[in-house]
Amino acid sequence: MDYEPIVNNLAQQVFDALAPRITPEDMERVRKAYLLAKEAHAPQKRKSGEPYILHPIAVALIVAKELQLDANTVITAFLHDVVEDTPYTVDDIRERFGNDVAGLVNVVTKQKKEIYQTTKQVDNYQQILASLHYDIRAVMVKISDRLHNMRTLQSMRPDKQMKIAGETDCFYAPLANRLGLFEVKSDLENLSFKYRCELEYGDIERWLQQDEADNRERLQRFCKDVKGTLKDHGIQCNVETFWRRPYSIWRRMKQQDVDFWHLPNRYYVRITFWEDTMDDPLTEKETCLKIYNLLTRDFRERPGSFINQIEQPKENSYQCLRLMLLSEEGVWEDVQICSEAMVKASQ
């Protein structure tokens, strides 16, 4: 199989994600880092048989697109395995990319020791935590590295899958949570659950697919009705249905001691608006309240369902107004009202 078009396309996605926010000089350095990583890893393959270079490119894409970090961090992501797995040294990196990148690459490189103080894995954890004092960008690269490894874990042996998934759940997901990377934390937890509890994950995924198919048309009509109501009052917004992930469903089932089909709020409808498209000079909170007032004129609100998570945000800083509205089909729908900025802040 010719992987060259895949490699080039993935690398271009990194460049495109960075282009709006870095200088042409920095873009040249990023491209230079990509070419060095591609040359250094050329002979290497992943367990799946794919060229190894796909991994550092994917990590760089997470850093550039999902975490929105700077050029030097993306360069570090491209080079994060170069010193560990190829003849290149930290001094080589310093000569080409400067002290900042060299320092970051040195921190993310697993240190080879003859004797480990405890175990190799525990020493690695200690190195990651110690890097928090050096530069948090290094930890961001390590977490991105783990996220891509979890997304491609299917190529590993079952015992390795279980080991890596356990490490992810116990160390990397809580670390991502502490750093405020709530979307990454959720991804890591869900992927870990997929490999640690394969049967439960498979059952819930199948039930979710069935539930979505059974309710899709009704929810599409409800979203269309909501969007139409708001459009009539000059409010442009997105109205979408979001289904909770298997790990979130499983955790809620355990907490509430119910089966899947008796679990409430398996999905929610989110109304998202952009401040710069609003004609009225209102704050985000005022716009949320305006949308709430408009909707409760046209739809029946379930008594006692209103929750103001703008004044009292969730742990992940997610802010919204929550309520239950009655659809034309007579179903109470879980609705969340928020701005695009509120969503981004929680991720």
Please describe what each predicted stretch is.
Residues 1-23, 38-44, 53-66, 70, ...:
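Nucleic-acid processing machinery
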Residues 9, 28-32, 36, 100, ...:
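Generic alpha-helical secondary structure signal
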Residues 17-33, 90-100:
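Short, mixed-charge amphipathic alpha-helical segments
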Residues 35, 61, 103-107:
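Generic alpha-helical structural context detector
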Residues 73-81, 141:
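Active-site alpha-helical segments that house and flank conserved acidic catalytic motifs
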Residues 78-85, 89-107, 181:
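Hydrophobic or amphipathic alpha-helical targeting/insertion segments
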Residues 104, 108-113, 135:
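Transcription initiation cofactors for RNA polymerase, centered on bacterial
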